[in-house]
């Protein structure tokens, strides 16, 4: 864009309501926001700079459970606990029977020093409880259910409204900071025992497996860590973690726990790119090196930013100290319009601390009794040792991910499943056409389940609008002290929080999933077949409403299928299974296996997508020897129930136009009998086109 075009842009904006929003920014940022995205190719190759800012210890629901148009507190299809209540009703062993998410009763909550909670391998696997997700209070304490809202963290919310938020982004491992950062920087935690692994905590003993920056270095892709050196990026300086929380890197440059970096000498790539930085104790600011590189046009192709402790958002530090820090990063990146037009900034969090999130993470089955997978689960199961229980390496709970770039403006939500290795996969997607940058440590299972983040972008026709972000100058720390923790008290009267009203534009997803159920007459068992005709792998979790075992995990790669069976010998021939999948996908199957053996009706339902139009068809059939009356209802909209009388051997197609619900569906087919036949299919028909968030999300 020429200088004259930039002036025209700003002149036109001044004549609209957007002018007030533009005035929130310094002149250099207003100029930068007038620059359109680099569109040299209209593809991911237009991204020339990838910047990753990984903050600390917040869960998705803790920050964004009330945000408009994401899968938060208003989720219409949350996981059901074994007691039949939703996962939001977390059991309490002492005191009230349960605890719901609550907003702490404190003024200016975004500036409060909210307490830190347990967040290690043992307590996180304890809360996860083999996928039942019902022991958060016992393992984390009551503050686990505390959340923030827009008035508390307005900068975070308006970043989400201005750019793109990912509401299915998980931390990589249900454990602490270092293991999750090892996933970001290396692709695993030494799961195969190489180089001193596996590492499940913050031992920082010195490791030897390969890291991704080394892969980039060997390939010729430029990279750098932006940080402050504190009192020294060496053992004497605790690798950047100092007693002064306003300098250093809080020890968050986890590359420095690898021997190849510890032993690197000045002048070597590993030293110069990972063990240098600002020195604010001697003068200057935390952002001088970043600002200089942006100004000079020398921002690397890939870079990571590590904040000092006070700005990391790690409890007990205030969330809004982090907001101030993030704005300074944005100011630096947008100070050179040409650089910003080619830059993608990913803002995420290493782990959830001890804060609750309601979406049960995908996990690999630990054994045949726990499920099946079409892709190898090698490297995804920890066998246990003297101090750590056995369990899957991941995924962990959801954490926030904001994708801030010229290609992600507009307030979108992307609901594909991601984790920290998705960052490595994005770098691969960008540079693999010219460089050998495949991350060697990322397991096949993780590559199947976790996407590469490209679905969050619109490279072909990016949004040319400007974001509206609040000023964060009031969030700069008023002192340089540490403060005692604020410990909130749960309210005596509880109620479920409601999300902000309204829909959110949603990116197209690569999913096309089917779960088919039928009674296996040869075994008398109930059989589920998981079929994936989409372009990405998917993880399913199956729970039972009438038995105490489970849940079971199933992973199905793109264009593959698998099946499993459940006996009803101990449940009076009754089966009651619910399948959970990505982006609100749910299937429920209830009935009696005796229907296939006697003279009764034996109904079944399958479904098919009309992808071109975003609609769905149910096929109702009766394989039994008696007639059956089935009623079909749709939870979206006000359509009257449809009633069908099926004779033995009859089939009926039931077509549903989903335009009014933006291709979302929640269809139930029932014979009306207590504990009788029920099929329920819910989710979104993906058409390859953008859509909206789930209209059934409960809002205020």
UniProtKB/Swiss-Prot annotation:
Signal peptide bounds: 1-34
Single GO BP term: lipid catabolic process
Record flagged with keyword Zinc: no
CDD domains, alphabetized: PLC (cd16014)
Disulfide bonds: none
Top class in the EC scheme: hydrolase
A molecular function (GO) term: phosphatidylcholine phospholipase C activity
EC number of this enzyme: 3.1.4.3
Keyword set, alphabetical order: Hydrolase, Signal
Top-level taxon of the source organism: Bacteria
Keyword presence, Transcription: no
Membrane-crossing residue ranges in chain numbering: none
A Pfam family assignment: PLipase_C_C
Post-translation changes: Predicted to be exported by the Tat system. The position of the signal peptide cleavage has not been experimentally proven.
Catalyzed reactions per annotation: a 1,2-diacyl-sn-glycero-3-phosphocholine + H2O = phosphocholine + a 1,2-diacyl-sn-glycerol + H(+)
Functional summary from the UniProt entry: Hydrolyzes phosphatidylserine as well as phosphatidylcholine.
Entry's family note: Belongs to the bacterial phospholipase C family.
Name of the featured protein: Non-hemolytic phospholipase C
Lineage: Bacteria, Pseudomonadati, Pseudomonadota, Betaproteobacteria, Burkholderiales
């Amino acid at each position: 864009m020429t200088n004259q075009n930039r002036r025209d842009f700003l002149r036109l904006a001044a004549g609209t309501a957007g002018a007030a929003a533009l005035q929130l920014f310094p002149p250099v940022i207003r100029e930068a926001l007038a620059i359109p995205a680099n569109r040299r190719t209209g593809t991911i190759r237009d991204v020339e700079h990838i910047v990753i800012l990984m903050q600390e210890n917040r869960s998705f629901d803790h920050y964004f459970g009330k945000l408009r148009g994401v899968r938060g507190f208003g989720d219409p299809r949350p996981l059901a606990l074994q007691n039949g209540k939703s996962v939001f009703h977390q059991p309490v062993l002492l005191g009230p029977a349960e605890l719901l998410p609550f907003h702490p009763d404190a003024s200016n909550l975004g500036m409060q020093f909210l307490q830190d909670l347990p967040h290690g391998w043992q307590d996180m696997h304890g809360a996860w409880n083999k996928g039942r997700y019902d022991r958060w209070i016992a393992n984390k304490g009551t503050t686990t259910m505390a959340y923030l809202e827009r008035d508390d963290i307005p900068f975070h919310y308006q970043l989400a409204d201005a750019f793109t938020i990912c509401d299915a982004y998980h931390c990589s491992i249900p454990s602490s900071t270092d293991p999750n950062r090892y996933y970001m920087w290396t692709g695993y935690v030494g799961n195969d025992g190489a180089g001193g692994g596996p590492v499940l905590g913050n031992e920082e003993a010195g490791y030897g497996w390969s890291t991704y920056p080394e892969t980039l270095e060997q390939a010729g892709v430029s990279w750098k860590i932006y940080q402050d050196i504190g009192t020294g990026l060496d053992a004497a300086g605790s690798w950047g973690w100092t007693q002064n929380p306003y300098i250093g890197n809080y020890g968050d440059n986890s590359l420095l726990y690898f021997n190849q970096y510890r032993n690197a000498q000045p002048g070597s790539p590993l030293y110069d790119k990972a063990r240098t930085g600002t020195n604010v104790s001697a003068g200057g600011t935390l952002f001088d090196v970043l600002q200089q590189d942006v100004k000079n046009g020398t921002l690397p192709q890939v870079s990571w930013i590590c904040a000092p402790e006070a700005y990391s958002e790690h409890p007990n530090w205030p969330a809004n100290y982090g907001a101030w820090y993030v704005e300074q990063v944005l100011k630096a990146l947008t100070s050179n319009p040409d650089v910003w037009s080619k830059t993608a900034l990913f803002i995420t969090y290493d782990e959830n601390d001890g804060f609750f999130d309601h979406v049960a993470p995908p996990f690999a089955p630990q054994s045949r009794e726990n499920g099946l997978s079409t892709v190898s689960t090698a490297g995804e199961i920890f066998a246990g040792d003297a101090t750590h229980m056995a369990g899957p390496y991941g995924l962990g709970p959801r954490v926030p991910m904001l994708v801030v770039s010229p290609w992600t403006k507009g307030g979108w939500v992307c609901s594909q499943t991601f984790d920290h290795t998705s960052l490595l996969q994005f770098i691969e997607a960008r540079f693999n056409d010219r460089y050998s940058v495949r991350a060697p440590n990322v397991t096949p299972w993780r590559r199947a389940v976790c996407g590469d983040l490209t679905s969050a972008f619109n490279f072909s026709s990016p949004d040319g609008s400007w974001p509206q972000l609040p000023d964060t100058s009031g969030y700069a720390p008023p002192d340089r002290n540490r403060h005692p923790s604020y410990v909130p008290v749960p309210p005596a009267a509880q109620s479920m929080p409601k999300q902000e009203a309204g829909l959110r534009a949603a990116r197209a997803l690569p999913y096309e999933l089917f779960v088919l159920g039928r009674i296996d007459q040869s075994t008398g068992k109930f059989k589920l077949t998981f079929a994936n005709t989409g372009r990405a792998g998917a993880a399913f979790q199956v729970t039972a409403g009438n038995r105490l075992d489970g849940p079971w995990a199933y992973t199905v790669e793109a264009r593959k299928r698998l099946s499993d069976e459940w006996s009803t010998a101990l449940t009076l021939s009754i089966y009651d299974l619910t399948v959970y999948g990505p982006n609100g996908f749910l299937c429920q199957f209830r009935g009696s296996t005796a229907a296939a053996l006697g003279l009764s009706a034996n109904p079944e339902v399958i479904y098919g997508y009309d992808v071109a139009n975003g609609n769905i068809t149910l096929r109702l059939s009766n394989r039994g020897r008696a007639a059956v009356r089935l009623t079909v209802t749709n939870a979206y909209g006000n359509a009257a129930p449809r009633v069908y009388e099926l004779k033995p051997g009859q089939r009926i197609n039931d077509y549903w136009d989903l335009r009014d619900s933006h291709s979302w569906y929640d269809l139930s087919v029932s014979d009306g009998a207590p504990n009788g036949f029920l099929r329920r299919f819910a989710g979104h028909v993906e058409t390859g086109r953008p859509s909206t968030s789930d209209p059934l999300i409960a809002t205020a």
